[in-house]
Amino acid sequence: TVLLNQTGTKLAALGQVVIDPDTGEISAGLITEYQERDQDTQAFVDSINQEFSTVLSQVVASTDVALTTVDPSTGERIIRSQETNLGDLCADAYREVLDADVGLINGGGIRADIAAGEITYGDIISVHPYNNQATSVRVTGQQLLDALELGARYTPYENGGFLHAS
């Protein structure tokens, strides 16, 4: 027997696995409501937030339009099934940073919108919260086409591997 326990994202829940030592029975569940916060942990989190607040609030760019993961007319998330202005910008940025002919980013790695106006470093971290590394590789035209086709294989349905290209 293999027990699978997934808690979701953004720490919305904690996973709890209980093994009864007498019976060997295994149970799993999610904890989504908390009675009280641990004061030492909260103080630690607050100190980290304070330490990074200056860096995260630093303005690094601006935009005249909202940069989105959604369809502006319906509000439906589309970043994983079709192009968006934010996906295009991210792919453009990777192409520029890597001095490459083509820039690609998967829609599943783009996690937040950016409102029109000033863009902070914190906004960029919200869009790209993972510690992914930008990488440059040499590929053939066929390999590039194969990657694009693989990314679009579930269109029009959502797929975190949907590629935004520049």
Model-predicted regions and their roles:
Residues T1-V59, T155-A165:
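Active-site-adjacent helix-turn-beta-strand microarchitecture at beta-sheet edges
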Residues V2, I31, Q35, D46, ...:
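A near-ubiquitous, low-amplitude feature marking generic local secondary-structure context
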Residues G29-I31, A61-A66, S136:
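Short amphipathic
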Residues V2-L3, A13-Q16, G24-S27, T84, ...:
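Feature captures C-terminal
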Residues E36-I119, Y157:
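Hard-cation-handling environments
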